Amino acid sequence: MRELFRRLGLAGLLLAAGAALPQPASAPAGACDKPVYLTFDTGHMGVAPLVAEVLKRHAIRATFFLADEPTLTGGRTLDAQWAPWWRERAAEGHDFGSHTWAHDIWLEDLPPGPDGEARFRFRAVAGQEAPRIRELSAGQYCEELKKPAQRFAEITGWPMAPIFRAPAGRTSPALLAAAKACGFTYVGWSRAGFLGDELNSDRYPNAQLLEKALREIRPGDILLAHLGIWSRQDPWAPAVLEPLVTGLQARGLCFAPLREHPRYAALMKAGAAATPARKP
């Protein structure tokens, strides 16, 4: 299996996404004409089982952006312990994108290297680990984007879509150009779709975040949450996720994966003729 992925390379893992994106066993009844797009970035994974239960109960296909982050149990989000969890999500028909391997937060563009290649300064920080300041060339940043896709294919047998989310949403035109040259298109989130699960829970209690989301979210919005935030004392997902889902559905909204978003649909189908990664 490792040899198969090595031969396919990034093109096989990403460009096959349109042909091999996991499909649900049965599509939910009825057309989704007022969609919102629920997305999750990795985190400490403490609420990941709950998130999976809620999504399955309501037949929601979401989009996950993956980084190699520390977990509450002392492992990593993309280690062998979590491989079955990711395989199950893939089989349910969710979408997956890169969140960079080391959770690199862009700080600034640097002068080009001697060969003219773009360079960037990042703060790599994940969970409770000490931040690391490091400098990467465009080529090295490309490798940081590719590693989650390669690892995801290795542990699940499914390809990752050619999309990424920059940690903290911090980018520059040069960074986006470097990612695009590497085969990745950036996905952010809507202003109303910032669900606030990484905010201080004393200043932004769950009830307030839920009320705000239900009031402000509109069709077409991309929503952002996480699979566990170390710094939030009162976890968001147990209190807010299901009421948010049912509340938005009561307003006539529905949920769709990013492959159905008008901005990304063509991109995520672009590799329909490519050889797909295979299930192990």
What spans do the regions from the language model cover?
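Extracytoplasmic/secreted proteins, especially bacterial periplasmic and envelope-associated proteins
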Residues: P35, G46-L50, R57, Q81-P84, ...
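C-terminal domain-boundary segment and adjacent tail
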Residues: P24-G30, A62, L72, Q233-P280
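Active-site beta->alpha N-cap acidic-glycine motif
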Residues: P24-F120, V125-A130, E144-P162
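His/Asp/Glu-enriched short active-site or ligand-binding loop at hydrolase and phosphoryl-transfer sites
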Residues: R170-E216, L253-Y264
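Bacterial N-terminal signal peptides that target proteins for export
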Residues: M1-G12
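Hydrophobic residues in well-ordered beta-strands that form the structural core
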Residues: F64, F96-S98, G188, A225, ...
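N-terminal signal peptide c-region/cleavage motif recognized by signal peptidases
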Residues: A17-G18
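Acidic-and-aromatic substrate-binding clefts and catalytic sites of carbohydrate-active enzymes
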Residues: T42-V47, D68-Q81, D104-D109, I163-P173, ...
